[in-house]
Amino acid sequence: GVNGLSDALRSAKILTNQLPYNLLWRPIEVEILPKCLKHDIGLICYSPLAQGLLTGRYSSPDNVPDGLSRSRLFSGKRPLAAHGEEGIENETFKAISDIISLANELEEHPAKISLAWLRSRPGITSLLVGARSPEELDLNIPAFEYSLPQSVIDRLSSITQSVKEKLGSNADMWNGNNRMR
């Protein structure tokens, strides 16, 4: 978190910070990202497709396996969730639906525009993208040579703004009591 980053900056020059960041998971934009930008710290983003949510693989919260539905985007009543929060499933899946609609309008895959949005963000140096098959790899690679017009970047940001606001500044995906100092 921002406090841990501040402590580390007093001890050493920090070059990169590895954090979860994607269209649905934007809490780092509140405090951590501005601090990284101020100190020239590059961001390595993990979970850039929100564990597959941004691929359009899941049409509703009920389709998401327990192991993937334990983040604060989902109800704290899910079997493996430990955060104890209400979750924001309705807002999350409304945003996913709107992202898919925009991708269809652009005749692109939602994963491609989601990765391109993330690449467009200030301070991003790398995305840690996983692929379970050659087909997923073929889908992800073109996103690194694809740029979105600013108007589409702004639309995507707007689509997920309510999710961002409900999550607040707690960048901990799994715990409602922010363990990230």
Task: Identify the role of each PLM range.
Residues K38, D62-S101, E105, S120-T125, ...:
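Terminal-tail/helix-coil boundary detector
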Residues G1-E31, G42:
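Glycine/proline-rich, positively charged
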Residues L5, E29-C36, L115, I153:
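Short amphipathic alpha-helical segments and helix-helix/interface helices
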Residues A12-L15, H39-I41, Y46, G123-T125:
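Short, well-ordered coil/turn segments that N-cap beta-strands
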Residues G1, Y21-P27, S47-Y58, W117, ...:
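Glycine-rich beta-alpha junction loops
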Residues I28-F74, H109:
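Aromatic-lined glycan-binding groove of carbohydrate-active enzymes
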Residues N17, C36, L43-Y46, I99, ...:
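Conserved, mostly hydrophobic/aromatic
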